């Protein structure tokens, strides 16, 4: 009777809902339908309140960013020099779009400071560069040079996997930290327990993608190859029957320094074998974004957690529609946890940078 009443009184809503049920809109990599987002968010918030009432352990949590300013002439000269010498690099490894900067870091850091006020320190790992907007009086933000955490034999490096493999060496880094790429933005206020439960368990945010299916389609990106290399070592450590098929979503990643150190102690030789790849290579391992999170899960130190992260390409034709949707959700109080505005070389749309800046200024 309710459906019949809706059909008679509000036919436009009836047909809209019918279409959404048959062809659901999905904005995230976990397969959560847009119609279900509010219910998922509400349920998760209720669980977090319950957990906080059970125990409230003061866990210090840091945030770590990796960042490069591709406009820096000295950095450009280094990249050009070593690019000519590189031979064992993977597809897209030297593509300029991988290093292109749209001032995302400023807004990503701003989103952390605005929506995660409980964060202790924000570390920015970079190659002898300092963001132009950084206020020296902001004691929360710490600049970490590559030389502080990476052996000089492997420098300079333009390989994100090499940089990420050494994050646990950041001086004064907390046991519990959250790794960010600068294209990931916190979209709303979030509690500590979204990342680390009061009992110390971390969250792991898995996608519904499939590694083997992507490989079968010929999607042999450096990230996919590194994930499959890491999976091989995980099976060696935890059992060949291990059926890991899904990567993590493109969002922030809760990590434990002690598990990083354990992986290094067990697979030191395998890790060091790819550190000389100045650009992403076919034998890379992606410790921060796959290996360590899965090791944490297999060690019983993390749990599967819903994460509604809107993920889209900054240059795509769909980007403006996603910007509009995120601003609407901000207004109606139905914001996702986060959003990732990825950059790939899918088009030469010259307006994408202007559209991004217009949106991001309105959102924050």
Swiss-Prot record:
Part of a group II capsule biosynthesis locus. The gene is fcs1. It is an enzyme of class 2 (transferase). It comes from Haemophilus influenzae. This is Capsular polysaccharide phosphotransferase fcs1. InterPro entries: Stealth, Stealth_CR1, Stealth_CR2, Stealth_CR3. Stealth proteins are part of a protein family that is conserved from bacteria to higher eukaryotes. Family members were first identified in microbes as proteins that help pathogens to elude the host innate immune system. Microbial stealth proteins are involved in the biosynthesis of exopolysaccharides. Stealth proteins are predicted to function as hexose-1-phosphoryltransferases. Belongs to the stealth family. Its EC number is 2.7.-.-. Keywords: Exopolysaccharide synthesis, Transferase. One of its GO terms (biological process) is polysaccharide biosynthetic process. One of its GO terms (molecular function) is transferase activity, transferring phosphorus-containing groups. The keyword Ligase does not apply.
């Amino acid at each position: 009777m309710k459906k019949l009443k809706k059909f008679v009184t509000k036919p436009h809503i009836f047909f809209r809902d019918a279409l959404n049920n048959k062809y659901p809109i999905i904005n995230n990599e976990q397969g959560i339908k847009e119609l279900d987002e509010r219910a998922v968010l509400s349920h998760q918030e209720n669980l977090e309140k319950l957990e906080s009432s059970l125990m409230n352990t003061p866990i210090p949590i840091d945030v770590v960013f990796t960042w490069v300013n591709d406009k820096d002439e000295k950095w450009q000269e280094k990249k050009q020099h070593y690019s000519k010498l590189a031979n064992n690099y993977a597809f897209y490894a030297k593509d300029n779009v991988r290093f292109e900067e749209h001032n995302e870091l400023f807004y990503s850091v701003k989103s952390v400071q605005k929506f995660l006020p409980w964060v202790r320190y924000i570390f920015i790992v970079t190659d002898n560069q300092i963001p132009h907007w950084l206020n020296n009086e902001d004691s929360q933000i710490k600049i970490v040079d590559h030389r502080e955490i990476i052996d000089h034999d492997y420098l300079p490096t333009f390989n994100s996997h090499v940089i990420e493999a050494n994050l646990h060496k950041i001086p004064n880094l907390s046991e519990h930290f959250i790794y960010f790429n600068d294209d990931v933005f916190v979209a709303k206020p979030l509690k500590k327990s979204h990342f680390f439960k009061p009992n110390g368990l971390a969250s792991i945010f898995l996608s519904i993608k499939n590694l083997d299916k992507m490989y079968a389609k010929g999607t042999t990106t450096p990230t996919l190859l590194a994930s499959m290399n890491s999976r091989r070592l995980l099976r060696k450590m935890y059992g060949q029957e291990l059926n890991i098929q899904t990567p993590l979503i493109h969002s922030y990643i809760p990590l434990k320094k002690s598990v990083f150190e354990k992986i290094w102690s067990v697979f030191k030789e395998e890790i060091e074998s790819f550190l000389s790849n100045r650009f992403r290579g076919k034998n890379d391992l992606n410790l921060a974004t796959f290996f360590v999170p899965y090791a944490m899960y297999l060690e019983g130190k993390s749990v599967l957690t819903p994460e509604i992260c809107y993920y889209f390409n900054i240059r795509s034709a769909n980007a403006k529609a996603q910007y509009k949707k995120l601003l609407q959700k901000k207004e109606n109080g139905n914001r996702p946890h986060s959003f990732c505005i990825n950059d790939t070389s899918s088009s030469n749309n010259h307006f994408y940078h202007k559209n991004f800046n217009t949106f991001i200024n309105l959102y924050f």
